[in-house]
Amino acid sequence: MAVFVYAENINGIYKKAAFEAVSYAKAVAGQLGETVTAISVNPTDSSDLLYKYGADKVINIKDEGLKNFSAKAYAKAVNEVADGNILVFPHTTDASSVAPMLASMKHYSLRTNVLEAPESITPFQVKRRAFSGKGFMHAKADASGVIVTVSQNAFGVKENPASGTEEVKNLTIENEDTKVLSHEQSSGKLDLKEAEVVVSAGRGMKGPENWGMIEDLAATLGAATACSKPVSDIGWRPHSEHVGQTGKAIAPNLYIAVGISG
C-alpha cells in the first residue's frame, strides 16, 4: 500500500517543507518497496514539482470551501482520500495542526518532529526532537497506522524523480468552524521556518531604531530576520519574527544571535 504524504502549499504554491516531506515519504516507501502518493489542497503549482522528489501519484483536492485554512476541515479532506497505513506531514504550523486531528479521525499513532528515516518499520521506530529541541527520543509506533511530521531542515530535500500521475478529487467539505475576518500576507521576506540562515536580535540592540544593521546583515547573508520574545512583546519587532521555546521553532544551518542573553 502506498505511503501518503501531505504536500502543503501556501496560496497554491509549494514550499521547501512540502518537498522535504515528499523526500521523506520516498525514503519510507523505499524501505517498504511501496509507492508515494502526495495529497494537496487547491494547489496552483504543477505536480511536476512533487514528481521531482519522488511522488508517484499526486491527488489534488479541489474544494472552494477550503480556500481559507481550517485544521479540522483540511483533516476531513485528507481523510477522504488517504487510505494508507503511513502518512507523512511537514512539521509546519498549519500541517502540524492537521496531523493530530487526522490521527484522531483514523485512530492512528502520531510521532512529531521526526528527524530521520525510520530506524525500523516493524516496529515503526523513528528519531524525533524532544525537550524543546534539547534532546532526542527514539519513539516506536504501530506501523499498521501511523502519522509522522518531519522537522523542517532536518531530513533535507532530495531529488528522486518519478514518472508520476495526477488525479483531481472534487470535494465539498463543511468548513463552518472557521470564519476569516481579515488576512494579511507578508511579502518580500524569507520564511523563518524554511530559512537556512537566520539573524536574530534582542534587547541588546537598545531600540528599534538600531535594527537597520540587523536587516543589512541579513540581506548580505541572504538570511531571515528573527527576534527574542521581549523584543516582540514591547513592539520593536513583529510577533511573526519571535523565535524560541515560546515562539517559532526553527532549524537553520547557521543562526546568528545579536544582543540576546541566555
Where in this protein do the model-derived segments appear?
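N-terminal glycine-rich FAD/FM-binding segment characteristic of electron-transfer flavoproteins
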Residues: 1-262
